[in-house]
Amino acid sequence: RPPRPPPRGTPPRRHSFRKHLYLLRGLPGSGKTTLARQLQHDFPRALIFSTDDFFFREDGAYEFNPDFLEEAHEWNQKRARKAMRNGISPIIIDNTNLHAWEMKPYAVMALENNYEVIFREPDTRWKFNVQELARRNIHGVSREKIHRMKERLESDLM
């Protein structure tokens, strides 16, 4: 027999998530990594996953190569998926995430693993100031590149 429906007037059952995925987004230099570290300070069990990690050499130097960007994103998604399967919470994704399609794989795997997805952007005064972003970003992304990224940033996602 199928289960009986709840009596009339019964409030809908809300899903209570016990695990959280923070999807950070913002231009280079906007404060994403600082926000990720603050979240990790607030939640000491948190793990931070960034596609940028793929480009750090063993000696700690950052060496970005756009030819490997797709592989780097797949690598980061695989790490996040493994952490979700292990029930780690919260998980923090520290990527630029300029477009919805960049966040979708993380959101899908989060829902498949019963995680609440929380979207966050740094709330810094300079988050759209191209000159300041170029000065502050830790990977040497040029002002021109940040300007192009800013033009492509989907602003109505949150």
What are the residue ranges of the model-derived segments?
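Long, basic/Gly/Ser/Thr-rich N-terminal segments
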Residues: 1-8
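Conserved GTP-binding G-domain of TRAFAC-class P-loop NTPases and closely related GTPase folds
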Residues: 6, 13, 112-158
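Phosphate-binding P-loop
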Residues: 12-18, 84
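Walker A (P-loop) ATP-phosphate-binding motif of ABC ATPase nucleotide-binding domains
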Residues: 21
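Hydrophobic anchor at the beta1->P-loop junction of P-loop NTPases
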Residues: 24
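Conserved glycine(s) of the Walker
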Residues: 31
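Conserved substrate/cofactor phosphate-moiety recognition/catalytic segment
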Residues: 34-86, 128-132
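Glycine-rich phosphate-binding loop used to anchor ATP phosphates in small-molecule kinases
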Residues: 67-118
